[in-house]
Swiss-Prot record:
GO terms for cellular component: riboflavin synthase complex. Catalyzes the formation of 6,7-dimethyl-8-ribityllumazine by condensation of 5-amino-6-(D-ribitylamino)uracil with 3,4-dihydroxy-2-butanone 4-phosphate. This is the penultimate step in the biosynthesis of riboflavin. Pathway: Cofactor biosynthesis; riboflavin biosynthesis; riboflavin from 2-hydroxy-3-oxobutyl phosphate and 5-amino-6-(D-ribitylamino)uracil: step 1/2. Keywords: Riboflavin biosynthesis, Transferase. GO terms for biological process: riboflavin biosynthetic process. Gene3D superfamilies: Lumazine/riboflavin synthase. CDD domains: Lumazine_synthase_archaeal. It comes from Methanobrevibacter smithii (strain ATCC 35061 / DSM 861 / OCM 144 / PS). The gene is ribH. This is 6,7-dimethyl-8-ribityllumazine synthase. The active site is at residue 77. (2S)-2-hydroxy-3-oxobutyl phosphate binds at residues 74-75, 117. InterPro entries: LS (IPR034964), LS/RS (IPR002180), LS/RS_sf (IPR036467).
Length: 138
């Protein structure tokens, strides 16, 4: 039995990048005796909040990781998406009293930058597990 069951919400936008992030996240979870038990794919980072909420409502989910890549475009859209998504993600973690780890790279980065940051998937799992451990100590 896994130490912690982790849900993952993964953006389809920049799919090639987010799938690499998910692969690294699954490897990291397994190496730490945890498991990503449910993966929910959403259109983009801005669309994550409802899926995160649904996962947090499940008793069997101990934490949620978010995986996405917000790449800079011709407008400030990437800034708006990242700011609003990260704020809502933090709010959901507080509301449900479960860790929600931010594995979203960007904003203000190029596609090449995003490829260099696929390890955010691994980092999100690390953060989720550390938070579960710390919360269990309280």
């Amino acid at each position: 039995m896994a130490k912690y069951n982790i849900g993952a919400v993964v953006a389809e936008f920049n799919y090639d990048i987010t799938q690499m992030m998910l692969g690294l996240a699954k490897e990291e979870a397994k190496s730490r005796d945890c498991e990503i038990t449910q993966v929910v794919t959403v259109p983009g980072v801005f669309d994550m909040a409802l899926a995160i909420k649904k996962l947090l409502e499940k008793d069997e989910i101990d934490a949620v990781i978010t995986l996405g890549a917000v790449i800079e475009g011709a407008t400030d859209h990437d800034q708006i998406v990242a700011q609003h998504a990260s704020r809502k993600i933090a709010d959901l973690s507080l509301e449900y009293e479960k860790p929600v780890a931010l594995g979203i790279s960007g904003p203000g980065m190029t596609r090449l930058d995003a490829h260099k940051r696929v390890d955010y998937g691994k980092r999100a799992v690390e953060a989720a597990i550390k938070m579960c451990d710390r919360l269990n100590e309280i």
